[in-house]
Regions:
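N-terminal, motif-rich segments that launch catalysis or mediate targeting to/interaction with membranes
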Residues: 1-73, 78-81, 99-203
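Catalytic Zn2+-binding segment of zinc metalloproteases
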Residues: 90-102
Length: 203
């Protein structure tokens, strides 16, 4: 939301502040009961975890559609929670392991590093403008492709802490900018709901 304010999207920022608790519930829910198993997507072969048709691409689109569905029914609690869950999936895809689909490639260590250092390292935050795309699929493809590029860029760095720092600097900024972009897209889609009286289906 800080990025939205910095870029002058005050109306949008205030809207999301109202429903921040619901969004946070969705962010947490997205990782519960092994749902994170499907937060993987390789943009090269367009697949997630082996043997499963559900992946970060299908899940993010499903959550987004459900968010629109519930809000079209005036159910902001579930609608904003689904939006938060969608944001979680989009954010996960900025991490190389989620795009490479390799659970054992220092995945937990990297996430622990980010949790421990996110508030301490100023370079992990950005005020750059939101990334604007037309749909959720574009965000999934861009974030996962960027994650693969980060992995390639820093793969030969021997020191794990240095590698984590460099990947986190880029991945976290991408996460913030893409989330802000999704917020703007979702806000605009909600405005269309009011104007068009469009019917959405639960996915």
């Amino acid at each position: 939301m800080d990025i939205l304010k910095e870029d002058g999207y005050d109306t949008e920022a205030k809207f999301y502040e109202i429903f921040e608790s619901y969004i946070n519930e969705g962010l947490v829910w997205a990782d519960q009961d092994f749902k994170s198993y499907f937060h993987f997507y390789n943009p090269k072969n367009k697949r997630g975890m082996y043997g499963h048709s559900t992946n970060a691409m299908t899940l993010a689109n499903s959550y987004y559609k459900n968010a629109l569905y519930f809000i079209s029914k005036n159910d902001y609690k579930n609608g904003m929670a689904y939006f938060g869950a969608m944001c979680h999936v989009i954010q996960d895809l900025t991490i190389p392991q989620h795009a490479k689909i390799k659970l054992l490639d220092s995945h937990k260590q990297f996430e622990s590093y980010v949790k421990s250092n996110y508030k301490k390292v100023k370079r992990f935050k950005t005020n750059e403008s939101p990334l604007l795309y037309k749909n959720i699929s574009d965000y999934v493809n861009f974030n996962s492709t960027s994650a693969l590029n980060l992995d390639y860029m820093y793969k030969n760095i021997p020191n794990q802490q240095t590698k984590f720092y460099l990947v986190a600097c880029n991945a976290l900024k991408l996460s913030q900018r893409s989330t802000a972009g999704c917020m703007l897209m979702f806000f605009n889609d909600l405005e269309k709901i009011k104007q068009e009286d469009k019917i959405y289906e639960y996915n």
